[in-house]
Design a protein with these regions (language model features):
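C-terminal regions of mature proteins
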Residues: 107-244, 248-252
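A short acidic/small-residue loop/turn micro-motif
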Residues: 245, 266-267
Length: 355
């Protein structure tokens, strides 16, 4: 039986302070980015580890128009559990605000952010046009100070040490108090469905602020396990062929797979891996298409191998690895990008994803 996809959305609009310097704007943006990341991780943890009364929940702060930004809370509740689901999410947000924004967590996030800044700085002369376009869009549409990409990267690098729990809580206090400029939206196909009204949602917001949520308990062990605790069966290259046109090599592996390898100096010390095969959605029966549509969204949300998401995140902390999957109409693929220093764990991650 299909689960009705009703949804409840709570929105709040608020005015953004005037930024007189690039540093003020970048610091505000960093606080917002780290806050959104903490909220997303904690809500995902709650869905995986607790008796959640909702199928999904997203919450975060985003730009709206010039001088304004807003908080969006979108909840897909279990059927008939709209009020209970909203109460759960709002109480979890209150718990996050009180206990999840810590110096330790922000140190983890800022360390990972530095890795991204190093990557961006390495390709500064090869930035795509879309990056420069966004600089002008942010200036003219959002009122951000106009600055070169290098200036933004440098400002972010030097401001990361100032992003601690006090800074993020100060940013949070700027907009979180009060209920002005709130909008509620309920979505569903049945006009007779008993959705919660605005009075009920406002009451739930106020009750959540007055609640007494429990602090978080650190469940991850002090000594983290290795990502891969076994040695996979080794393959071998049985044939090598030089491809003159693209200046690459074609390797045939012992399992019949073809590998195309090309070295370049586009980003020194970085590598990209793409694996694909024909097939895709076109080979799936109709009843499996809804699950296929959710594949990209749910990828790694519940962990990998024998590790739940929270432990997996702890194991991968500090490693600069990006893995994505794509299920097209007639093909499927998985891509991995990383650096020389993280090559071994990147290939372990890739192996566990595909086997």
């Amino acid at each position: 039986e299909d689960i009705p996809q009703n949804a409840v959305v709570l929105m709040k609009r608020f005015r953004k302070p005037e930024f007189r310097t690039l540093g003020e704007q970048v610091k505000d943006q960093l606080c917002r980015e780290f806050y959104n990341q903490i909220v997303g991780e904690r809500l995902n943890d709650f869905i995986q580890e607790e008796d959640a009364l909702f199928l999904s929940a997203q919450a975060g702060v985003h730009d709206i128009v010039r001088h304004y930004e807003g908080q969006n809370i979108a909840i897909t509740p279990l059927p008939g559990m709209e009020k209970e689901a909203v109460r759960q999410v709002l109480e979890q947000l209150e718990r996050i605000h009180r206990y999840a924004i810590t110096d330790q967590k922000l140190k983890e996030l800022t360390d990972n952010y530095r890795l991204g800044l190093k990557q961006s700085a390495a390709m500064l002369r090869r930035m795509p046009n879309s990056v420069y376009l966004k600089v002008y869009q942010d200036h003219f549409l959002l009122g951000y100070p106009l600055a070169e990409v290098a200036e933004k990267l440098d400002a972010a690098w030097h401001l990361l040490d100032s992003i601690d729990s006090r800074a993020v809580h100060a940013w949070l206090d700027r907009w979180n108090a009060g209920d002005l400029n709130r909008i509620y939206a309920v979505l569903g196909n049945n006009p007779d469905y008993p959705f919660p009204d605005s009075e009920s949602l406002t009451r739930l917001l106020r009750e959540a602020r007055q609640s007494s949520p429990a602090p978080y308990v650190q469940a991850v062990a002090d000594t983290l396990p290795s990502l891969m605790d076994f040695t996979p069966v080794a393959g071998r290259i049985v044939k090598t062929k030089r491809l003159k046109g693209p200046g690459a090599e074609e390797w045939t592996l012992s399992n019949g797979a073809k590998v195309y390898y090309k070295h370049n100096d586009y980003e020194s010390g970085a590598f990209n891996l793409l694996a694909g095969s024909p097939g895709g959605r076109s080979l799936l029966p109709a009843e499996d298409l809804p699950s296929a549509d959710a594949l990209n969204t749910l990828f790694l949300q519940y962990g990998l191998y024998k590790y739940p998401a929270r432990l997996l995140n702890a194991i991968m902390r500090g490693h600069n690895i990006d893995i994505n999957i794509d299920l097209g109409e007639r093909s499927e693929s998985i891509s991995c990008s990383s650096t020389r220093d993280d090559a071994e764990i990147a290939f372990q991650f890739f192996h566990l994803t595909v086997v």
